Amino acid sequence: MGDIRTFVFAIEDTETTQGLCKTIGRSSSFDQNSLCKPYNLYFDEPELSRQHAVLCIKTPIPKIEGVPSIEQLRICIRDLNNKTGTVNLVSDGPNDEIDLKNGDAFGLIAIDNHPFRDNHHLAAKLIFRIELEYFDEAREIVKCTITNVTFGKNNTVSSFPIHSATSTEDSDSSWYGLSEASTQTEVADECHETNTILTRGGRFSILSLRKRGSKQDQKICSNFDRKIHETSSFEEEIEVCTDTDTTEEKEEEEEKEEGDDEEGEIELEIIRVKRIKGRTKIKKTLTCFSKNKKIITPQHSNSMWLLLIVILIFDRLLSN
């Protein structure tokens, strides 16, 4: 599935001469009012015109007694492009003004015999389904959902972007009381009313949408993050270790002893043997010690003994 656009409106706003109208067109980054947002009908499609078509929802006058108001709503798509900009997918009627029912689909950007797969052909580059449902039946507030179903039947992901549910863009309430909560583009599991507002179009309810994430998806993400963490730790360990040919050496400890003051600084390369998965690793670090401390290693100790022996021999020779 592709984009999901959602907005709410009051049925009394459809009882005017023109009804409820919403522009369909190409999004533009230069105009804040025509940016691609989850509560409008502007799309990132270069073949669309700036004002490609218009969605009209209207209640016929006079109203029919005994019939629910939502069932009397007339849905119409009018072409503003005059270049086969809209496509009638539900009947053989004209393409420039398409009458729809709740749940019907319509097309944008007509194409001739465009092959898709399995001998199927697309009549339009973009196909949308429109659905109306009560959000608050007592107050006659309706929720309109328009879904991109261009490749839905063929299990092919649409190429159009899906808005993030954590969008930080300011909500535009100029479209008949649209609330910020209704800008969520993903399908919500819960929807309830939190407040009621009044606009120039009438009274409207503020939507509050809640989405429960899939436990399976959360589990997959958790396992993936854990694998990444383990891989990163292993790579860091590889960088500081070098393989050796021995497999049974034990970890050696550095022996540090304090001695007399000595001028200058001593640079000493400390070798740490570390066993990893049955193989011995050696970690090398270059350490710089101050002149106030003296570290004696086995090699240094042997040198001192040799020096002491040489001094004793030299002293014996002098005494003779």
From Swiss-Prot:
Pfam families: FHA. Signal peptide: none annotated. Residues 22-86 form the FHA domain. It comes from the Eukaryota. Residues 242-264 are annotated as: Disordered. This is Uncharacterized protein YGL081W.
